[in-house]
């Protein structure tokens, strides 16, 4: 919490940090999930961080929204969203933002190095706009809540059915699946998405990644999203995935990724099943199966031909284990192979 945070914000954040609440996403969120990640790449081919209380991050952000709601305006014009100044002097278009205001479709909100703002995403959530950020309201429809992040960093929290909130970037689109996340884009159009609640789909062309709670994915202009990796993934795995996703890593990078992967990295290997060349797919499956045993109904033959039901069944097992491992970190010792307490 920085020195610019108003006292009322600090109080609400502190209260929110004491609320132990968490909900696992529903099972039926994932029909046909593998068809949304199996895009062909245009080219073939950080150190671990300390634990953070994942269940509290969205709640702390919700405290900021509570402050906004207390002072929100009455009627908002059609095709516009409410916006609130948090610090400094953000601009909406060319006009300085007062305490509260609106941003209309087509308008840009811009912050400098000392200003911040909060955008209310209709009635389904909010976006915290960090310093040095430029973001535009693209659509304000009930079925399509859409922003475009040109550069900078945002934190988004949405409580709504999947696929109602979108953030376009130069490297693709973040699609909300009931989630909270931080999205950063640099001046080159490259960036990172870090999911702190639920799941996010990041898509560019035919290439898609499903990023769960506690995972990150790098994004690159003209390449789209990289393979998701755990917050504490080994550096060797991150380097191998970067070579596969954004360079011509080839078989050597695949072997490097498989050698570095742990049971906690099953989400990454599951994505690789549909991303590597067919001759390498068996090695990926065998390594994945050794780290997280496949559930009933999952066979090597089905996985190798990218059968929809097979991959979805395996994914449901992998993502539940990852969810339990992340959400209970520091509370229970969860076996990363099975998701059960040890």
Where are the model-predicted features located?
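Acidic, Pro/Ser/Gly/Ala-rich intrinsically disordered segments
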Residues: 1-4, 100, 340
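A short, acidic loop/turn at secondary-structure junctions
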Residues: 2-35
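Single-pass transmembrane signal-anchor helices and their membrane-water interface zones
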Residues: 27-38, 53-79
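Short, low-complexity patches enriched in S/T/P/G
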Residues: 44-55
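Flexible, surface-exposed loop/linker segments and immediately adjacent secondary-structure boundaries
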Residues: 69-108, 112-113, 121-293, 297-300, ...
């Amino acid at each position: 919490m920085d020195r610019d945070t108003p006292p009322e914000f600090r109080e609400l954040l502190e209260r929110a940090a004491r609320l132990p609440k968490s909900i696992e996403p529903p099972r039926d969120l994932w029909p046909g999930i593998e068809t949304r990640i199996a895009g062909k790449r245009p080219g073939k081919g950080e150190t671990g961080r300390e634990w953070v209380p994942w269940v509290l991050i969205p709640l702390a952000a919700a405290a900021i929204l509570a402050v906004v709601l207390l002072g929100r305006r009455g009627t908002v014009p059609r095709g516009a969203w409410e916006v609130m100044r948090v610090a400094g002097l953000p601009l909406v278009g060319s006009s300085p933002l007062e305490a509260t205001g609106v941003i209309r479709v087509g308008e840009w909100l811009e912050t400098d190095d000392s200003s911040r703002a909060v955008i209310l995403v209709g009635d389904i959530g909010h976006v915290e706009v960090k310093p040095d950020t430029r973001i535009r309201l693209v659509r304000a429809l009930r079925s399509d809540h859409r922003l475009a992040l040109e550069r900078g960093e945002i934190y988004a929290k949405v409580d709504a059915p999947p696929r109602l909130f979108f953030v376009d970037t130069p490297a693709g689109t973040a699609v909300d699946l009931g989630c909270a996340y931080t999205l950063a884009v640099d001046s080159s159009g490259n960036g990172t998405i870090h999911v702190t609640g639920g799941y996010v789909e990041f898509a560019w062309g035919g290439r898609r990644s499903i990023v769960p709670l506690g995972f990150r994915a790098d994004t690159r202009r003209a390449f789209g999203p990289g393979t998701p990796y755990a917050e504490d993934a080994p550096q060797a795995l991150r380097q191998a995935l970067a070579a596969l996703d954004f360079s011509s890593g080839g078989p050597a990078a695949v072997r490097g990724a498989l050698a570095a992967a742990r049971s906690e990295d099953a989400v990454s290997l599951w994505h690789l099943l549909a991303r590597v060349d067919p001759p390498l797919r068996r090695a990926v499956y065998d390594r994945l199966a050794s780290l997280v045993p496949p559930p009933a109904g999952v066979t090597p033959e089905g996985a190798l031909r990218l059968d929809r039901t097979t991959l979805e069944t395996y994914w449901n097992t992998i993502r539940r284990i990852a969810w339990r491992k992340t959400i209970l970190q520091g509370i229970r010792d969860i076996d990363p192979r099975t998701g059960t307490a040890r």
